[in-house]
């Protein structure tokens, strides 16, 4: 999973921390003069402002709302607290979101899909960093190739065309070995959603034993199916950053491939895992909603809750099983991309329990051996409802919703925003009622 930490400390990029401050200025006041005064307060505390946005407020007072993104080099939030205090002394009520273990604040999170650019390159492990026990650790050609592909991913920004990789003959051969072996097992081991979508990927995205599909083609296909998109990444992201991406229906995927010496094994996610394991299910509407539900639960969650969510992700999206009549099939990418795991989960050695996030979140799991325990979902729809109930147990100072039109996270912190949701529900209900009446006619 994309949440592993780097115990060797390799490839870790220097960390910076973020806050977002929200405040309003009265329409009748000197907007420009007032804003400059408040910016000077922030500057005084040696905090960088990375973005400023303004818009007419939706409150009855018709104020101007300002949104400031801040960046600072230390996790210590004392200076941010001083900024809030100084603003309050000026009669300005400011709200902040920031990366902090202080429970007074909610951790910072991306508000727009383009905000994913802020952390996309802050990987825990670079794609070019290989531990001594990695199959390609002593292969200089392979290591250089990993560095090359990681560098390509590092240049990507939201809205760009995903760079296409010119895969070598050896890389395509490795892909083909994995592809052919897994495809033999899919009919008897994979869930019916995977079985339905995989041929569509072959038809629309160039999936075949002789071709490694390009992320841009896959992303285009997913956007048409479920609104999901793929974003290239250099290596392993933190659990928080990876899960936050899911809230925007964005899946961070690697483009490099495992070492050819052991084509049926990889110690970390590679393009075989991402494209053969994860991608097919992201084209299924119910699974797409379920995955986003996990992402939305991570928005503003505490470090402790992020760990619980990561574990639930492991037992669902990575190693989840589901019921299909009297049989049990796999939907987790860690199973669907591993020949050994696909054969193992059907044996008596593997214990299977009904999926319950309140139980799964506290279950330990191995990362280097076959899973001794799997959780079985009744359906993706029910699993989504269970995850929503689980997320409701998290203590957050606000509620949120994802706006698919603006691809942004909205904080539901005033009456007008709630009324907007009510209007949306009413409009959708009217459309539904009209459709039902025409079906009955």
Curated annotation (Swiss-Prot):
It catalyses: (6R)-L-erythro-5,6,7,8-tetrahydrobiopterin + L-phenylalanine + O2 = (4aS,6R)-4a-hydroxy-L-erythro-5,6,7,8-tetrahydrobiopterin + L-tyrosine; (6R)-L-erythro-5,6,7,8-tetrahydrobiopterin + L-tryptophan + O2 = 5-hydroxy-L-tryptophan + (4aS,6R)-4a-hydroxy-L-erythro-5,6,7,8-tetrahydrobiopterin. Coiled coil: none annotated. The keyword Metal-binding applies. Pathway: Amino-acid degradation; L-phenylalanine degradation; acetoacetate and fumarate from L-phenylalanine: step 1/6. One of its GO terms (molecular function) is phenylalanine 4-monooxygenase activity. Keywords: Iron, Metal-binding, Monooxygenase, Oxidoreductase, Phenylalanine catabolism. GO terms for biological process: asexual reproduction; L-phenylalanine biosynthetic process; L-phenylalanine catabolic process; tyrosine biosynthetic process. Fe cation binds at residues 273, 278, 318. Its cofactor is Fe(2+). Belongs to the biopterin-dependent aromatic amino acid hydroxylase family. Homotetramer. This is Phenylalanine-4-hydroxylase. It comes from Dictyostelium discoideum. The lineage of its organism: Eukaryota, Amoebozoa, Evosea, Eumycetozoa, Dictyostelia.
């Amino acid at each position: 999973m994309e949440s592993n930490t780097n115990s060797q400390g390799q490839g870790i990029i220097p960390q910076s921390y973020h806050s977002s401050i929200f405040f309003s200025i009265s329409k009748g006041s000197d907007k420009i003069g007032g804003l400059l005064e408040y910016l000077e307060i922030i500057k005084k505390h040696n905090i960088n402002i990375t973005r400023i946005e303004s818009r007419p407020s939706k409150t009855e007072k018709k104020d101007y709302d300002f949104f400031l993104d801040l960046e600072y080099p230390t996790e210590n939030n004392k200076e941010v607290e001083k900024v809030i205090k100084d603003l309050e002394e000026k009669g300005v009520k400011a709200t902040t979101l920031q990366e902090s273990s202080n429970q007074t604040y909610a951790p910072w999170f991306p508000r727009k899909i383009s905000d994913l650019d802020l952390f996309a390159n802050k990987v825990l492990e670079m794609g070019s960093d290989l531990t001594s026990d990695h199959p390609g650790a002593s292969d200089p050609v392979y290591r250089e190739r990993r560095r090359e592909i990681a560098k390509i991913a590092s240049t990507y920004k939201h809205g760009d065309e995903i760079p296409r990789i010119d895969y070598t003959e050896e890389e395509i051969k490795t892909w083909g070995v994995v592809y052919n072996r897994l495809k033999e097992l899919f009919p008897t081991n994979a869930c019916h959603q995977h079985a339905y979508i995989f041929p569509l990927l072959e038809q629309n995205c160039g999936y075949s034993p002789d071709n490694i599909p390009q992320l841009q083609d896959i992303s285009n296909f997913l956007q048409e199916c479920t609104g999901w998109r793929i974003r290239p990444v250099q290596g392993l992201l933190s659990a928080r950053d990876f899960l936050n991406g899911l809230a925007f229906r964005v899946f961070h995927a690697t483009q490099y491939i495992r070492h050819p010496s052991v084509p049926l094994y990889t110690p970390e996610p590679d393009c075989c895992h991402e494209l053969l394991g994860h991608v097919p299910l992201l084209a299924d509407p119910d699974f797409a909603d379920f995955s986003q539900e996990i992402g939305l639960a991570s928005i503003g969650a505490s470090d402790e809750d992020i760990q619980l969510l990561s574990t639930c992700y492991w037992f669902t999206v990575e190693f989840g099983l589901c019921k299909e009549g009297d049989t049990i099939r796999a939907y987790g990418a860690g199973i669907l991309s591993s020949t050994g795991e696909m054969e193992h989960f059907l044996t008596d050695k593997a214990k299977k329990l009904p999926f319950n996030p309140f139980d799964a979140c506290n279950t330990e799991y191995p990362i280097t051996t076959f899973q001794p325990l799997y959780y079985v979902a009744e359906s993706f729809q029910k699993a989504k409802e269970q995850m929503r109930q689980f997320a409701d147990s998290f203590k957050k100072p606000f509620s949120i919703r994802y706006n698919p039109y603006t691809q942004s996270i909205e904080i539901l912190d005033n009456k007008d925003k709630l009324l907007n949701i009510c209007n949306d529900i009413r409009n959708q209900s009217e459309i539904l009622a009209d459709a039902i009446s025409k079906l009955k006619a």
